[in-house]
């Protein structure tokens, strides 16, 4: 049987930081590239990284403030220009850098008249302030001013219901998002069968992480999410002593082909290569381009997965199932293609 040779990139994926700058203490910028990627891969990687950078990257922020006997957050404190609510909003904007886990405490204890900035916060050793000039309040009179703060490392945006409190403790809507913005773009290169894509990724952070550090963390988080799928044991799969063999309930399209075999005879699906099915060369090459090499790979795909393969046609799907009916003792659903 003659097989058509399909050209493809054999180069190793490489990434590089092509631009890095500090626009201000609270605005870092980085631009990265990843290449070479096959058609469609750049979009897949770009979407996943953008979501992980914005939603999964951890940050440290102030989550609570305790002023003493203050009746409510709209109160004013004698000798202070700002209301309690304005001070809470200023504390919310403080950018912290740390590697702590759990909750830590901090405090502010000063005497007026003077401006209070982030530099006046007394922090635990594991925490530092990115921009010490960030304003907090203005003391207009020679009064003592003290705030107890709670600091926590987390991810995302968290709000808490404000309850009437007698001890002057107020929650702060915590924004644990060190990545301010992420953009990605795709550039197509090459021609013919040698086409490939380059992914450009732009990251802006608040200074608590550099863009490169944020990219590392987001990548690790994505890897951790997919690791369970690499484990040998899978729910619903009955493995025998030979891990390459399992019974037929999962030899199907995920939802539609739930009972492919009439009998309970076991088939070593990952030992049957698509080369052995004597498929037409066009269909064979479509499957190979999609990294489908064995019967197990093939039967793990849904109809929608196959139709998304580049150049895959309805006739190719029909040919595949006609071949499976011919070679395997399966009860395949009719008119699937």
UniProtKB/Swiss-Prot annotation:
Region described as Alpha N-terminal domain (alpha-NTD): spans on this chain: 1-233
Catalysed reaction equations from the record: RNA(n) + a ribonucleoside 5'-triphosphate = RNA(n+1) + diphosphate
This protein's record includes keyword Chloroplast: yes
Enzyme Commission number(s) of this protein: 2.7.7.6
Family: Belongs to the RNA polymerase alpha chain family.
Record remark on domains: The N-terminal domain is essential for RNAP assembly and basal transcription, whereas the C-terminal domain is involved in interaction with transcriptional regulators and with upstream promoter elements.
Record note on quaternary structure: In plastids the minimal PEP RNA polymerase catalytic core is composed of four subunits: alpha, beta, beta', and beta''. When a (nuclear-encoded) sigma factor is associated with the core the holoenzyme is formed, which can initiate transcription.
Protein's name according to its UniProt entry: DNA-directed RNA polymerase subunit alpha
């Amino acid at each position: 049987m003659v097989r058509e040779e399909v050209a493809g990139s054999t180069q190793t994926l490489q990434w590089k930081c092509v631009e890095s700058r500090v626009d201000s203490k609270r605005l870092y910028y980085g631009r990265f590239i990843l290449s070479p990627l096959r058609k469609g891969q750049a979009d897949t990687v770009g979407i996943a990284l953008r979501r992980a950078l914005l939603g999964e990257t951890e940050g440290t922020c102030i989550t609570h403030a305790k002023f003493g006997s203050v009746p409510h957050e709209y109160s004013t404190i004698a000798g202070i220009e700002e209301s309690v609510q304005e001070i809470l909003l200023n504390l919310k904007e403080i950018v912290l850098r740390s590697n702590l886990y759990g909750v830590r405490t901090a405090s502010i204890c000063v005497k007026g008249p003077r401006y209070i900035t982030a530099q006046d916060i007394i922090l635990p050793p594991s925490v530092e302030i990115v921009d010490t000039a960030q304003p907090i309040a203005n003391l207009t009179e020679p009064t003592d001013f003290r705030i107890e703060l709670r600091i926590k490392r987390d991810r995302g945006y968290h709000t808490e219901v404000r309850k009437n409190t007698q001890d002057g403790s107020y929650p702060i809507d915590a924004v644990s998002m060190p990545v301010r913005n992420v953009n990605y773009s795709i550039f197509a290169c090459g021609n013919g069968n040698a086409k490939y894509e380059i992914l450009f990724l732009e990251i802006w952070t608040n200074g608590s992480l550099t863009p490169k550090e944020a990219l590392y963390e987001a990548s690790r988080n994505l890897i951790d999410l997919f690791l369970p799928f690499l484990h040998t044991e899978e729910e619903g799969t009955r493995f025998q002593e030979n891990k390459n063999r399992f019974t037929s309930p999962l030899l199907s399209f995920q939802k539609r082909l739930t009972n492919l075999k009439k009998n309970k005879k076991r088939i070593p699906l990952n030992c049957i290569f698509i080369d052995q099915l004597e498929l037409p060369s066009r269909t064979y090459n479509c499957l190979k381009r999609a990294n489908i090499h064995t019967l197990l790979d093939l039967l793990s795909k849904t109809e929608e997965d196959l139709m998304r393969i580049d150049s895959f046609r309805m006739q190719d799907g029909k040919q595949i199932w006609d071949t499976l009916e011919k070679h395997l003792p399966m009860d395949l659903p009719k008119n699937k293609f």
